[in-house]
Regions:
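Short Gly/Pro-enriched turn/cap motifs at secondary-structure boundaries
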Residues: 129, 144-148, 172-175, 189-191, ...
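A short core secondary-structure module
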Residues: 163, 167-211
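Long, acidic (Asp/Glu-rich), low-complexity accessory segments flanking structured domains
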Residues: 231-250
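Short Ser/Thr-interspersed hydrophobic loop/turn segments at strand-loop and sheet-helix junctions
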Residues: 64, 87-92, 186, 202-207, ...
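A short, Trp-centered hydrophobic/proline-enriched beta-strand micro-motif
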Residues: 132-141
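Short glycine/proline-enriched turns and hinge-like loops at secondary-structure junctions
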Residues: 79-80, 148-151, 175-180, 193-196, ...
Length: 403
């Protein structure tokens, strides 16, 4: 967003503390209203039944919350990564499972294609992703390639005339069971290791592609996850993204942006946990008075507030820095270190926030059907996905020592 910073007196105290401009606050508030009205009512059934609401993405697209970073000529909003992070923050408050699917579609697939695909590929695939007619996903992780996703990658692609033929499998793929378009990484020159990886646009309708199994998760239920199989999957040669054997640049740049975009999801969940805990503390009575009157509960609420605000500051700082990431950039240097630090801190701190939130709720927090339990079951993923906490520490330390 390029809106100039307004005078401080025209802004509320929350904006002053967060550093949001009026235009940015409007993006956050509008997304919050939409998510509360349209997405929150879906959250309980999504968790209970592992249900995917097929109407959700078309509705989100019609409302203008897909293709945030895409140009208007493709149907997008023409905004920046920071605005996209604000939308994710709002969605995370009200339906964190759908927010996870949204960011896999919006950032891992759509924005990745926007940054790396050719103009012809963008014209072919982005409009349907922006409208919500198609769901997007990214295929990187494999059964034997998690933290070592590049070095241990086994999925291959060989050239056969006007097609590439993919063989292998991908695991833990968000949106996998419902995706129409996927950005998939495969080794085109296996002897070159990580330097022999290429990126491809794969349609779920291509021969040889199938969903092997839908995976049932502890948390983020309703956000669909699957193992995908490529069995002589024929992909048109025109669907190679960028240059052959240069996919590692797409991977590393995308991972830094992915980490920058996990933190706003953590922030939204943390904000909701604090709000729900405040409401519970005010209404739950023991010993003839609200438990909010007890100093131990007040201590937990104070700790939660401090941690939420710390996540907010770090998240916004990182999003603003990631706004300037050039195409093909990242995977090294200050932004690589910062995005790893941001998501490590946000996920770890969110864990502390939710631990206090469940304790405030007491027995109710341990019951599956409560909202706070729904949040608590989900947050472990954020210490695993987009690089585990341990990998994040390796990145941070590596950049420190190189400096």
């Amino acid at each position: 967003m390029s809106a100039s910073q307004p005078a401080a007196e025209s802004r509320n105290s929350a904006q002053v503390f967060s550093g949001l401009s009026d235009a940015e606050q409007e993006v956050l508030d509008a997304a919050d209203r939409f998510a509360r009205q349209e997405l929150y009512p879906l959250s309980r059934r999504m968790d209970d039944e592992e249900w995917w609401p097929p109407q959700a993405f078309p509705l989100i697209g019609r409302t203008g919350y897909l293709g945030i970073t895409a140009p208007p000529e493709l149907g997008g909003a023409g905004m920046d990564l920071f605005a996209s992070g604000l939308v994710l923050q709002a969605f995370g408050r009200w339906n964190h499972a759908l927010a996870l699917s949204w960011v896999a579609h919006e950032n891992l697939c759509l924005n990745n294609l926007l940054r790396n695909a050719s103009a012809a590929q963008a014209r072919q695939y982005l409009p349907a992703l922006i409208s919500g007619a198609h769901v997007g996903a990214l295929g990187l992780t494999e059964p034997g390639a998690g933290s070592d996703a590049l070095g241990s990658m086994r999925t291959t692609a060989r050239r056969d005339g006007d097609h590439w033929v993919l063989n292998g499998s991908k695991l833990y793929i968000t949106n996998g069971p419902v995706a129409d378009v996927l950005l998939v990484y495969a080794k085109t020159s296996p002897d070159k290791g990580a330097q022999g990886i290429s990126a491809f646009i794969v349609e779920s309708a291509f021969p040889g592609f199938r969903v092997a199994q839908k995976l049932v998760k502890m948390g983020f239920r309703g956000s669909q996850t699957a193992e995908l199989v490529f069995d002589e999957c024929r992909v048109p040669a025109a669907n190679l993204v960028g240059e052959e054997d240069r996919g590692v640049r797409v991977v590393m740049s995308g991972l830094d942006l992915e980490r920058a975009m996990v933190a706003p999801l953590c922030l939204g969940i943390a904000e909701r946990a604090l709000a729900v805990s405040l409401e519970y503390a005010r209404t739950r009575k023991q010993f003839g008075q609200p438990i909010a009157n007890f100093q131990m509960i007040q201590s937990k609420l104070a700790d939660m507030y401090v941690r939420v605000e710390a996540i907010r500051v770090f998240t916004y700082q990182t999003l603003r820095a990631a706004n300037d990431l050039e195409i093909g950039g990242g995977g090294r240097g200050g932004i690589h270190q910062l995005t790893a630090a941001s998501v490590m801190f946000a996920a770890d701190t969110l864990n502390q926030v939710l631990d206090d939130a469940v304790q405030i709720h007491g027995g109710a927090g341990y019951i599956w059907e409560t909202e706070i339990n729904r949040l608590y079951r989900s947050i472990k993923l954020l210490e695993i996905g987009a690089g585990t906490t341990e990998v994040r520490k390796i990145i941070i330390a590596g950049e420190l020592l190189r400096g």
